[in-house]
Amino acid sequence: MRALGRHVLAEVYGCSFEILNDIKKVEEIMVKAALEAGAEIREVCFHKFSPQGVSGVVVISESHLAIHTWPELGYAAVDVFTCGERVNPWDACRYLTEKFKAADVHATEIERGVIEPPQAAAVNL
């Protein structure tokens, strides 16, 4: 059995209101997190909500990083999904939680695209 990708889902608490509510800072941190993990960036799209909050995605060759922030709660929901063996999603997750000044993080990893032996043989995995 082999997985096509690794998906880290992070619940990030106790973050700086100012950072989570600043679209430029959130985008910069997410882009740098992707680069810290060794990913190749393809597209970046972020949106600022009123009265507060930021959502965005960094599309990488290896998949994506996504975020939704609730600055008033000091909370961010973060996904880091990478395909292949070259990029470690935990490197990106560690970087961004540090930069958001998180007090607490609950993260889990799930395997995506688990390929069983019959499928693996069909596609030479």
From Swiss-Prot:
Pfam families: AdoMet_dc (PF02675)
Any one GO molecular-function label of the UniProt entry: adenosylmethionine decarboxylase activity
Cofactor binding: number and manner: Binds 1 pyruvoyl group covalently per subunit.
Modified residues (Pyruvic acid (Ser)): S63
Top-rank EC class of the record's enzyme: lyase
Active site annotation, chain numbering: S63, H68, C83
One of the GO biological process terms: spermidine biosynthetic process
Alphabetized UniProt keyword annotations: Autocatalytic cleavage, Decarboxylase, Lyase, Polyamine biosynthesis, Pyruvate, S-adenosyl-L-methionine, Schiff base, Spermidine biosynthesis, Zymogen
Posttranslational mods: Is synthesized initially as an inactive proenzyme. Formation of the active enzyme involves a self-maturation process in which the active site pyruvoyl group is generated from an internal serine residue via an autocatalytic post-translational modification. Two non-identical subunits are generated from the proenzyme in this reaction, and the pyruvate is formed at the N-terminus of the alpha chain, which is derived from the carboxyl end of the proenzyme.
Biochemical pathway: Amine and polyamine biosynthesis; S-adenosylmethioninamine biosynthesis; S-adenosylmethioninamine from S-adenosyl-L-methionine: step 1/1
Quaternary structure (record): Heterotetramer of two alpha and two beta chains arranged as a dimer of alpha/beta heterodimers.
Family: Belongs to the prokaryotic AdoMetDC family. Type 1 subfamily.
HAMAP family: AdoMetDC_1
Full protein name: S-adenosylmethionine decarboxylase proenzyme
Organism: Moorella thermoacetica (strain ATCC 39073 / JCM 9320)
